[in-house]
């Protein structure tokens, strides 16, 4: 009996895709710290993280409901709860909707209405626009659909300030440009899975050379965008962004050259290291804010 209950609980947890949520929440804290230069109340941070977790869990759960048919086809996703019938589809839908409503009400109560509305917008965009419209129709699915994954920085900033500014927009764009290289590198490895499921990911419909060229272009856009925040951040962020950006661009160029040269291609290496890149850059931003270091802009003025 206990084993069955535990299995059911784990199935519902798996619906939320916790590993995906982890990285998204990593971006929320630095955005909040930057918004008030490290003076944010810890209770507000924890409340925003909890509300953001519920919102992301809602979006991921509803995504699993819509994608249950293709999850059964793809080897990478065949063990997801709905793909193996561990959770009834109707229960998963109610679970996802309940989390979504709870996240809105929680953030409205603990932060402000703007933060709550941004979470609702994120859930709606991810499920209705990305999952139901873009994902199975165009190779640009992850380009525009990835905007949902950029929203935690907007939620975090608005939870502190009750408004939006250019800084969270820059952070939004960093994640926006980061998403295609991150996702396409994974899709290169699981190309046959996506092809079998009828999902037109770029690696499915284009040559590896074209894919790696696009990865390279988006990587450059990501690094250049990250540098535009340097005047509003401190020297730690500036140094970390320069080093991490150069390192990531080197890996992207290596992947492109290996494809052009006919060498063994290892896209998963770029996929895994892209997680490290994003984490390092945002941690650098958080350290700057917590230490209360002078911004680069003030040092140069």
Swiss-Prot record:
Q: What class of enzyme is it?
A: transferase
What EC numbers are recorded for this enzyme?
2.5.1.141
Question: What catalytic activity is recorded?
Answer: heme b + (2E,6E)-farnesyl diphosphate + H2O = Fe(II)-heme o + diphosphate
What GO MF terms are annotated?
protoheme IX farnesyltransferase activity
Reply yes or no: does the keyword S-adenosyl-L-methionine apply: no
Q: What else is known?
A: Carbon 2 of the heme B porphyrin ring is defined according to the Fischer nomenclature.
NCBIfam families in the cross-refs = cyoE_ctaB, PRK04375.1-2
| HAMAP family linked to this entry | CyoE_CtaB
**Which protein are we looking at?**
Protoheme IX farnesyltransferase
Q: Name the source organism.
A: Rhodococcus jostii (strain RHA1)
Identify the taxonomic lineage of the organism of origin.
Bacteria, Bacillati, Actinomycetota, Actinomycetes, Mycobacteriales
- Which gene specifies this protein's sequence? ctaB
